């Protein structure tokens, strides 16, 4: 049983709070106190709207991730999903990966409970093939490759944008499967403090607090501060080999600060900071009953960014940013420590001339890995150009980019997308693109590494059909993404290790069809997505590990009397736990129920 209580002064927009009642040993009820000022703006009879777990974005929403420039969703050809804070709260998720798993085209795998290593597969692609940003700050590990999802504190995230499909022509290395951007809260209006407290099964305790708002003349200075603490005794996670009969609990602490200053109508400064610490238990496969130990993983993440945005004229704007992130992973008592530092510099230029949009960017990325005995670094310098057109029924987006790596030289990528509105509310889309990922410093310079490894490269093509009107929408996207020079762990012989080495030996293909939709029928809002995919190794014909050929999410909510009720089911087919396809992981289904009612002017029961 988990009973959190939140005291919150919400934003002036329509307030939505939900928490799911999951069919597992954890039932969640929330009593939320909202400010009298916000309550006066809404009558008692007004329904509290549920933010669905996979909200279909409105065409009026603006998106940054597709082109690195803020654009209305209606102007984009890209396949994008948006998750807002209300949706995050409604999900009842304990981690970011659980929220993402509800979105079209995404499935996850996890090695144990909260705090243990997780993988996020975007359209079936390797977890390292997704570029991840927090407030524009790149998050990556030069040891394992890709973001360490368990390090990212969900309590500090206000909005998520997911771009499906290769985007290396915009973002450079890593964006073979897509891009996920995370945004922290941004202050506006009067000061709005909030406090949340929760207790639950498995000895779980949570507390969070923060404040956001704006001050100064016309709110020129805005701020948002937040902190959260979570502790759980966990459960006994079982692994192969000897079983350690302990509970693998976790402790996490996180905080964030976001400050903004509008110098005048044309210039603005922003600064962001996020930090998190996670201490989680796990079971080592080499556990011995005669010498029991409590194995722990210690995760630390810090991101910081400073940016200046300038609107020089009605048609020309620039943005300059400096970003920094530190990703640290350690295990005890088994001695292992790896730390990745990333530094980024970006000068973005945008021109708008009628229906035409032009962009030009210079970018530098510096990577550093400390993983004894490795002490290595590298840099990438890039020039990116983009062109967009939105006129009448036609939408065009073109991007090219050249990356110069200090280790392996230059790499060119490009993408072209076209959308045609052939009827009212309908649009057909087509796109092609290339992408790459540079091998990590660990892949090249560890005892298992090979210095001559080449970047993994991909070619993608996709077709889409979309419909959107009022509260109903539908989309279907068919894609095929082929990767060459795939880096895999093979037998010994080309490196110093006798256990095996990394090598460019494999080819992979990620192909499939994603259906997604939302429909309002007789007072019931339906939503869902179905993915049919075939992620496979082209050399062996085997299905790629830990990815199912079918997975889906279906849900509905409605209002009955004074209650808003909802239900959701997530289902996934069988997968394999190894590349040889000999260890089968069975399919599963997860059911969620949630409900909401206002019991007094200032109280909502969830």
Regions found by a protein language model. Give the residues of each.
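N-terminal Sec signal peptide and the immediately downstream disordered periplasmic leader
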Residues: 1-103, 261, 519
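Short acidic/polar hinge/loop motifs at secondary-structure boundaries
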Residues: 137-164
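Extracytoplasmic beta-strand/coil segments of soluble accessory domains associated
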Residues: 97, 101-137, 158
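Outer-membrane beta-barrel signature, preferentially recognizing the C-terminal barrel domain
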Residues: 288-311, 341, 406-409, 421, ...
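Conserved C-terminal beta-signal and adjacent last beta-strands/turns
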Residues: 6, 10, 26-27, 212-216, ...
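Periplasmic-side early beta-strands and strand-to-turn transitions of outer-membrane beta-barrels
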Residues: 168-169, 181, 188-190, 196-198, ...
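Gram-negative outer-membrane beta-barrel transporters
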Residues: 387-395, 480-482, 502-579
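Face-selective signature of the C-terminal outer-membrane beta-barrel domain
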Residues: 260-278, 295-421, 472-478, 520, ...
């Amino acid at each position: 049983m988990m009973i959190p209580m939140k005291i919150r002064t919400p934003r002036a927009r329509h307030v939505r709070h939900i928490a799911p009642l999951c069919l597992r040993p954890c039932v969640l009820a929330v009593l939320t106190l909202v400010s009298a000022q916000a309550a006066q703006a809404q009558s008692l009879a007004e329904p509290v709207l549920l933010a669905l777990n996979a909200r279909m974005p409105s065409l009026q929403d603006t998106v940054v991730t597709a082109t690195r420039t803020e654009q209305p969703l209606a102007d984009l050809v890209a396949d994008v999903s948006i998750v807002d804070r209300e949706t995050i709260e409604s999900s009842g998720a304990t981690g970011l990966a659980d929220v993402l798993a509800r979105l079209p085209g995404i499935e996850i795998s996890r090695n144990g409970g909260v705090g243990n290593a997780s993988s996020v597969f975007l359209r079936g692609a390797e977890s390292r093939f997704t570029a991840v940003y927090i407030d524009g700050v790149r998050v990556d590990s030069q040891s394992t490759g890709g973001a360490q999802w368990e390090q990212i504190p969900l309590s500090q995230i206000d909005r998520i944008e997911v771009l499906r499909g290769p985007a290396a022509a915009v973002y450079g290395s890593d964006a073979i499967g897509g891009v996920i951007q995370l945004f922290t809260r941004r202050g506006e209006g009067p000061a709005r403090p909030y406090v949340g407290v929760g207790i639950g099964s498995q000895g779980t305790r949570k507390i969070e607090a923060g404040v956001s708002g704006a001050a100064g003349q016309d709110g020129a200075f805005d701020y948002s501060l937040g902190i959260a603490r979570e502790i759980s005794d966990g459960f006994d996670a079982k692994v192969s080999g000897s079983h350690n009969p302990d509970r693998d609990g976790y402790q996490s602490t996180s905080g964030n600060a976001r400050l903004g200053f509008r110098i005048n109508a044309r210039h603005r400064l922003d600064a962001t900071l996020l930090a998190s610490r996670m201490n989680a238990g796990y079971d080592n496969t080499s556990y011995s009953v005669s010498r029991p130990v409590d194995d722990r993983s210690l995760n630390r993440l810090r991101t910081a960014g400073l940016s200046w945005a300038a609107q020089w004229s009605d048609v020309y704007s620039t943005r300059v940013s400096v970003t920094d992130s530190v990703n640290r992973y350690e295990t005890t008592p088994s001695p292992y420590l790896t730390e990745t530092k990333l530094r980024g510099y970006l000068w973005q230029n945008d021109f708008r001339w009628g229906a035409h949009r032009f962009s030009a960017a210079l970018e530098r990325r510096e990577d550093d890995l400390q993983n004894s005995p490795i002490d290595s670094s590298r840099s990438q310098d890039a020039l990116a150009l983009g062109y967009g057109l939105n006129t009448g029924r036609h939408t065009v987006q073109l991007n090219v980019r050249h990356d110069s790596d200090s280790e392996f030289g230059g790499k060119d990528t490009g993408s072209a997308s076209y959308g045609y509105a052939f009827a009212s509310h309908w649009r057909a889309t087509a796109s092609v693109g290339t992408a790459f990922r540079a091998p990590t410093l660990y892949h090249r310079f560890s005892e298992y590494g090979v210095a001559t490894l080449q970047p993994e490269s991909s070619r993608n093509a996709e077709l889409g059909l979309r419909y959107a009107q009022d509260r109903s929408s539908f989309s279907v996207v068919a894609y095929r993404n082929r990767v060459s020079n795939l880096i895999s762990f093979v037998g010994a012989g080309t490196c110093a290790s006798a256990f095996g080495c990394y090598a460019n030996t494999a080819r992979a293909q990620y192909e499939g069809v994603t259906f997604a939709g939302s429909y309002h029928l007789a007072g019931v809002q339906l939503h869902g997505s179905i993915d049919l995919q075939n992620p496979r190794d082209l050399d062996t014909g085997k299905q790629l590990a830990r990815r199912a050929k079918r997975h889906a999410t279906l849900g509905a909510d409605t209002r009955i009397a004074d209650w808003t009720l909802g239900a959701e089911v997530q289902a996934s087919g069988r997968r394999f736990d190894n590349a040889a396809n000999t260890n089968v992981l069975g399919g599963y289904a997860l059911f969620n129920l949630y409900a909401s009612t206002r019991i007094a002017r200032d109280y909502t029961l969830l």
